From Swiss-Prot:
It catalyses: D-glyceraldehyde 3-phosphate + pyruvate + H(+) = 1-deoxy-D-xylulose 5-phosphate + CO2. This is 1-deoxy-D-xylulose-5-phosphate synthase. Its cofactor is Mg(2+); thiamine diphosphate. GO terms for molecular function: 1-deoxy-D-xylulose-5-phosphate synthase activity; magnesium ion binding; thiamine pyrophosphate binding. Thiamine diphosphate binds at residues 72, 113-115, 145-146, 173, 284, 367.
Amino acid sequence: MDLLSIQDPSFLKKMSIEQLEELSEEIRNFLITSLSASGGHIGPNLGVVELTIALHKEFDSPKDKFLWDVGHQSYVHKLLTGRGKEFETLRQYKGLCGFPKRSESEHDVWETGHSSTSLSGAMGMAAARDIKGSKEYIIPIIGDGALTGGMALEALNHIGDEKKDMIVILNDNEMSIAPNVGAIHSMLGRLRTAGKYQWVKDELEYLFKRIPAVGGKLAATAERIKDSLKYMLVSGMFFEELGFTYLGPVDGHSYHELFENLQYAKKTKGPVLLHVITKKGKGYKPAETDTIGTWHGTGPYKINTGDFVKPKAAAPSWSGLVSGTVQELAREDDRIVAITPAMPVGSKLEGFAKEFPERMFDVGIAEQHAATMAAGMALQGMKPFLAIYSTFLQRAYDQVVHDICRQNANVFIGIDRAGLVGADGETHQGVFDIAFLRHIPNLVLMMPKDENEGRHMVNTALNYEEGPIAMRFPRGNGLGVKMDKELKTIPIGTWEVLRPGKDAVILTFGTTIEMALEAAEELQKEGLSVRVVNARFIKPIDKQMMKAILNEGLPILTIEEAVLEGGFGSTILEYAHDLGMYHTPIDRMGIPDRFIEHGSVTALLEEIGLTKAEVMNRIKLLMPPKTHKGIGS
């Protein structure tokens, strides 16, 4: 079949199971080949081929609503809804998004980049449906990794209480990104081994219906027998107690089982949970045999060998450098512990976990719990390193404020993927953390200019005992700078001048330092002497240096790879205002007030104007007339 010619899923209605099985194989081959060039979330999508096809055959999208959670398992859905020709642009600038995108297709009714949101969204859609009196099916498809998120459990509780008609598909592949952890995952394991429960339950109900109505005592006894047998067969029927009709577990790669259970679910009133067992990476051996999450999402790879295609890095990854330094310091201080919300591989904590298993805590997709747990450990004298992506730190905001900062707990928050992250797009860009952290009392916030300074900042953070401290660091690799042999402690709230200058000042930090230095070098050739300051402490700022700069009256340009609204530049404007320096020319460069979509970081920086050329232009515009040739008259 020509997969690129698919316009919508209606063609599936006429296909036999044998034809669907052939289609499954074709789709897997297409995904393996296509993603070998572009990269993407291959593991999750190879696992949901049959499930996605079965859903589109059995239901009528977009009238019936599919909510994919997490959204990276929606590639087959995209293919079946007419986007095959766009797969060569997957996750590229102006190309096909790697997550559901409402502006892409009417079949994408809910956008998910962060996990555990589908059930709440589905509850909202079901409530709206019932108010309007329409009849569509609402079908959230949630991976059991996403089910460990507290938000999903809150929604399960509410859905069961409201008894809304809904079919929840639990896509249980035993993994989220890394292997799942926690009691819920263990419970699902017990359910997998108790597949006879549904059959026994149905037989019991049939027999009980045939018992003559001889009084309440016998009926009550029968109910107790049924309940006792239920708990004997399946320890803790969690979903049924919440008010769901539980179906499964069923083989997620068997069309016979999928159709039988989907048809039963459609006829059942109230919320239904269909527990589907799938194999992550099915059909591609390197992905099938992955046990730690390497093949969850990848870059390009060689199909025949499974080797990843990537240039040899000239420097270590930022995640590896930070976690490696934490691990190094943990050898000397047994109070240091590491906490991650389901990202041990991405945060490069495998080495720490292997060396210090008793001090490593992967709490699952539970950012709020991770933050508050870190506070609890800190208040008992430990030194917790909370490794968390910038985009996921958003989910723990109240815990950072209420539990960490308000209690002045000595927690080191390692904010990974700070700044633009590229291909994962607007749900994952790490651009909001400065704005939502810099105003919180007690918190220190910093970002290094390179990996050498990064190691010193990790050392500073784990030796800081005055309260919480956070370090931002970007996705990708360092610059390959020379590393100091000895770790140092950087005085809190101090900046450094990287390049002297007497005509203007650039204040920046982190990934934009290199661009600022290059711009200053070019401006020097045009007769402008521009000072470049490494404003490595975003909070507290170096007030002594800042006051001196303001007293000089020099034009100031702030640059940050973060949102301008409430960001570092706003801090400088506020400080200048507080000192009464109303006439100092100050300009700001950063992320504009909109969500930044997917694409290479280079392309995105060009689009939003965070470039060397624009830095030079902004400096020239700040200068008074006649300071620079060609400006003024």
